[in-house]
């Protein structure tokens, strides 16, 4: 089976090089850190899934509707990295596994406090093989506006051929090279050491952990942070794993022209007129709808992605690709060349990790993806200071043993308020799983008519349970009578489940 590339923790997704068979051993890599673990990450037979708004990896696609021009060169930074030397460093305070945005963000902030940090990754300077799309205000709040290479003043949602919504919220694409360089420079200046290798295992002793690397080196550390994305090979889960799946097929392309306003990104296009001449595709789309997500960079360069918001099991890639081909034909988009092709997957929902446990997680490995949307980039970067502060504080306490330290980090990362919030988001995912195309259109018609504070907060994980309950009532009040009846009929079982789970939560 072909390898599956698991983007680093800040990216909520998995970019698959081919379909994934259940029950077979899977090979994963986080940014660069590879793991082989057949007892974890399993997907329904014949399905693969996509990463966040714009994860990319150059892969073979079984159905490509045009001639493809690929740039196979893998970009890398060229810093003179300070290397970990086991002859002079007997032990470090923190080992970060994975050099993705989340891992580097924590490494940078922990090292600012004088804590010794080693970051392990087979290609620590490699540019991340995924693009990130974010709301501009999310990056502005973290002083990262200089790390956006393209922004759109607003976005648009097409519900059908007659109705669309304009979203007055700027959207941006992350400059991957700039963001990584900024984080790497901070790490280097703070004295973070780097070790180029794969992590094979972590062995826990009473007062430290041993990180076993592929080159034979074993590094002793007080704390281990798993920032490897969705590999789930270092962080433990107990409950059965049965998430929803967000699937997508997309590419950056040079085109003769396209019909979209270059000042607006296309957040969702639920129109289905392009399928009217194919009864099978139309019937399938009616049941399990997909939408177009597009970033127009200019009049003849654009990112196009056909996306299944959430399904269980995921919509097969071949089906998604066929719908994309029909959509492009209908929109009269003639693709001249393709720069990047991506087949991507996001597991959404599912159980939280075992808490506490010795290995600390962040991002995908800590189940931080938004269960209703698939978003995670800004949420994870915003959580990095929380994780870093907890680690620094507990390391500074002479009374802190490794398990109590990790327990504190997990508790700060997943306080009861965040757990309750996630439970509501899982309820939202369950409702979306039950809707067909027409129900989905009615849902988003009501959703984007809410006050900006509410839908902004929902998408950006800024609302907590009391506000989310008001959000739910407002959404129900905004909905049409048909949508209300549908929500009551299909949303009652997941609502009961959410209430039961909330009532059983303990702080």
Report residues per predicted region:
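Flavin-binding catalytic cores
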Residues: 312-342, 382-410
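N-terminal chloroplast transit peptides
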Residues: 1-57, 61-62
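N-terminal FAD cofactor-binding segment of flavoenzymes
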Residues: 105-162, 178
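FAD-binding beta-loop-beta segment adjacent to the flavin cofactor pocket
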Residues: 286-289, 343-362, 415-423, 432-438
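A conserved FAD-binding loop/helix module that cradles the flavin
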Residues: 367-388
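Long, low-complexity C-terminal extensions of enzymes
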Residues: 385-507
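N-terminal Rossmann-like FAD-binding beta1-loop-alpha1 element of flavoenzymes
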Residues: 69-119
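Predominantly flavin-linked oxidoreductase catalytic cores and closely associated redox partners
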Residues: 109-113, 186-337, 347-355, 367
């Amino acid at each position: 089976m072909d390898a599956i590339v698991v983007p680093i923790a800040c990216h909520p997704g998995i970019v698959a090089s081919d379909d994934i068979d259940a029950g077979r051993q899977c090979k994963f890599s986080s940014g660069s850190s590879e793991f082989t673990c057949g007892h974890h990450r399993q997907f329904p037979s014949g399905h693969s899934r996509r990463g966040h708004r714009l994860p990319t990896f150059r892969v073979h696609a079984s159905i490509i509707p045009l001639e493809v021009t690929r740039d196979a060169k893998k970009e890398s930074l060229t810093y003179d990295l300070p290397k970990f030397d086991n002859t002079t460093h007997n032990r470090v305070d923190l080992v970060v596994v994975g050099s993705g945005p989340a891992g580097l963000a924590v490494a940078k902030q922990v090292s600012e406090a004088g804590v010794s940090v080693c970051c392990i990754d087979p290609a620590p300077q490699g540019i991340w093989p995924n693009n990130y799309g974010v709301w501009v205000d999310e990056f502005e709040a973290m002083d990262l506006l200089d790390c956006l290479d393209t922004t759109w003043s607003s976005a648009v949602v097409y519900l059908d051929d007659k109705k669309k919504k304009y979203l007055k919220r700027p959207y941006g694409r992350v400059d991957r090279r700039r963001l990584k360089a900024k984080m790497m420079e901070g790490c280097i200046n703070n004295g973070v050491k780097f070790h180029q290798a794969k992590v094979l295992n972590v062995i826990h002793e009473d007062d430290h952990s041993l990180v076993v690397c592929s080159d034979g080196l074993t590094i002793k550390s007080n704390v281990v942070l798993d920032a490897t994305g969705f590999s789930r090979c270092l962080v433990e889960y107990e409950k059965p794993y049965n998430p929803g799946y967000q699937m997508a097929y997309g590419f950056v392309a040079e085109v003769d022209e396209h019909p979209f306003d270059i000042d607006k990104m296309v957040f969702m296009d639920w129109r289905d007129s392009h399928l009217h001449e194919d009864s099978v595709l139309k019937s399938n789309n009616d049941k399990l709808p997909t939408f177009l997500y597009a970033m127009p960079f200019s009049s003849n360069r654009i990112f196009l992605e056909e996306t299944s918001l959430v399904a269980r099991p995921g919509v097969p890639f071949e089906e998604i690709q066929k719908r994309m081909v029909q959509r492009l034909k209908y929109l009269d988009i003639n693709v001249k060349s393709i720069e990047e092709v991506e087949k991507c997957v996001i597991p959404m929902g599912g159980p939280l990790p075992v808490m506490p446990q010795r290995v600390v997680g962040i991002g995908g490995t800590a189940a931080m993806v938004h269960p209703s949307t698939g978003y995670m980039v800004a949420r994870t970067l915003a959580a990095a200071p929380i994780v870093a502060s907890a680690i620094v504080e507990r390391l500074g306490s002479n009374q802190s043993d490794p398990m109590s330290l990790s327990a504190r980090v997990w508790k700060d990362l997943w306080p009861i308020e965040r757990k309750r919030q996630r439970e509501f988001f899982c309820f939202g995912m369950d409702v979306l799983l039950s809707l067909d195309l027409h129900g989905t259109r009615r849902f988003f018609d009501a959703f984007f008519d809410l006050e900006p504070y509410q839908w902004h907060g929902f998408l950006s994980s800024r609302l907590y349970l009391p506000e989310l309950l008001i959000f739910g009532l407002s959404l129900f009040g905004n909905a049409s009578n048909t949508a209300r009846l549908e929500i009551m009929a299909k949303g009652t079982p997941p609502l009961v489940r959410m209430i039961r789970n909330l009532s059983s939560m303990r702080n």
